[in-house]
A protein has these predicted regions:
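Membrane-proximal helix-turn-helix segments that form the acceptor-binding/catalytic region
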Residues: 83, 123, 132-150
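Active-site proximal beta-strand in glycosyltransferases
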Residues: 91, 107-127, 149-151
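Short His-centered aromatic/hydrophobic patch
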Residues: 94-100
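A short, active-site helix/loop in glycosyltransferases that binds the activated sugar's phosphate group
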Residues: 141-184, 378
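Conserved donor-binding/catalytic core segment of Leloir-type glycosyltransferases
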Residues: 193-217, 222-227, 240-241
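Nucleotide-activated donor-binding/catalytic signature segment of Leloir-type glycosyltransferases, i.e.
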Residues: 253-273
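Aromatic "clamp/platform" in nucleotide-sugar-dependent glycosyltransferases that forms part
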Residues: 294
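A charged, aromatic-enriched C-terminal amphipathic alpha-helix characteristic of glycosyltransferases
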Residues: 335-338, 349-387
Length: 389
């Protein structure tokens, strides 16, 4: 079987996906990546990869023109790649939807027997085409109709209300986590990991978000915590951690640090690259994690937090988190940021109760979210689509 994956070839999740796929089945993997080669790896688990690092440089200073035309330029370049490549694939699999991929969808059939798309959740929330979200959703619907399989965690009523024709071709698929595999084998205690990070073992570690993106609302959560009437009684017990390794703004981080210092908070601001071992140590060192992002497609960071038996305080507005509930994971769901902060103070007052509540999460995560386990659903879909390949 020959598969063309379309997505970010630099992504650690993408790399692990391809590696797990090749271990699980006989497949030739080609990758089209609409991003430059960051050279993060000495070698990739792909049989062929093409990095298309074109940017709309000519019009980059004219914001309207760039936003307006760039998806069409990106789609044209992808079309040129397919034509020049001249390969008829068994499957073209769009692992991450960009507005460009919903343009001129019918042409894909010329280069593949089957079309797959993966939806993680964010594609339905914020993307636009010609500066219109509704127009983008209309075009996305046409791409779904063209596709032979829609893979992901979007099997909820809201998604099917909007795209009822997707129901017969929807398949469950989720990325595994190499961090979860490491966590399952770690002998270090939570206190050991705190000390490895330079944090006092008796501190209650509080993680806000899982990247530097402002959509995690680090600033709003922090301000709500320090303004709470109970803050002065617990500030000496807390150590805040901000994992800002990806997509952080310098001024945004500076403002966070100013609030932390003004209120006498102990904290760590992680801005550099983190190895898998370092990420596993961070997860194990986490007592409480806030997940109050504007949107999320069930990030591996959340699954890793659960595997570490951290107490997760999460918003109830994420359409894919039903997967966690269905699997039996225990976490604290809230309707608003204000409620989340109130719940946080209850956790601080009754730590052992909440630690006991989430104690089975590690076993559940280890059983369900290793790459060896998760890749099975993806392999099943591929083999259903191309049984003779």
């Amino acid at each position: 079987m020959r598969v063309l994956l379309v997505g970010d070839a630099n992504s650690i999740f993408f790399v692990h996906y391809a590696d797990a796929l090749k271990k699980a089945m006989d497949v030739e993997i080609h990758v089209y990546s609409p991003f430059p080669n960051k050279q993060d790896y000495q070698s990739y688990p792909y049989d062929y990869v093409y990095f298309d690092d074109y940017l709309l440089k000519k019009y980059s200073d004219i914001r309207f023109v760039s936003w307006f035309y760039e998806p069409y330029v990106e789609r044209a370049r992808f079309g040129r790649f397919l034509k020049k490549n001249g390969i008829k694939y068994d499957i073209i699999h769009f692992q991450w939807i960009m507005p460009a991929w919903v343009v001129c969808q019918k042409a894909y059939r010329k280069y593949a027997d089957k079309i797959c798309i993966t939806l993680w959740g964010g594609e339905l929330e914020h993307l636009q085409l010609l500066r219109s979200h509704n127009y983008y959703l209309t075009k996305l619907g046409k791409l779904i109709k063209l596709s032979d399989a829609v893979i992901g965690t979007m099997a909820n009523q809201g998604f099917f209300d909007r795209f009822p024709f997707a129901k017969p071709i929807s398949r469950y698929g989720i990325y595994g986590s190499s961090i979860i595999e490491k966590l399952s084998q770690m002998s270090e205690t939570r206190e050991d990991c705190k000390q490895q990070m330079g944090i006092s073992a008796d501190k209650i570690t509080v993680v806000l978000g899982y990247s530097g993106k402002m959509l995690h609302n680090h600033d709003k959560i922090l301000n709500d915590i320090v303004k709470h009437e109970g803050f002065k009684d617990v500030v000496d017990k807390l150590h805040f951690i901000f994992p800002m390794s990806r997509n952080f703004g310098a001024s945004y981080c500076d403002n966070l640090e100013a609030v932390l210092k003004q209120n006498g908070c102990s904290y760590s601001m992680i801005k550099g690259y983190m190895s898998d071992d370092a990420v596993a140590c961070l997860r194990k060192a986490t007592d409480v994690m806030f997940q109050l992002s504007d949107f999320d497609g069930l990030s591996n960071s959340i699954k890793e937090c659960l595997c570490a038996n951290s107490v997760l305080i999460s918003g109830d507005w994420f359409p894919t988190y039903h997967v966690l509930k269905d699997a039996g994971f225990k976490y604290l769901e809230v309707h608003s940021r204000e409620e989340a902060v109130d719940v946080f103070y209850k956790v601080i007052e009754n730590q052992q109760y909440y630690y006991d509540l989430v104690n089975d999460n590690k076993n559940l995560a280890t059983q369900q979210y290793s790459w060896t386990e998760c890749i099975k659903n993806w392999v099943k879909v591929y083999k259903e689509l191309c049984p003779e390949s």
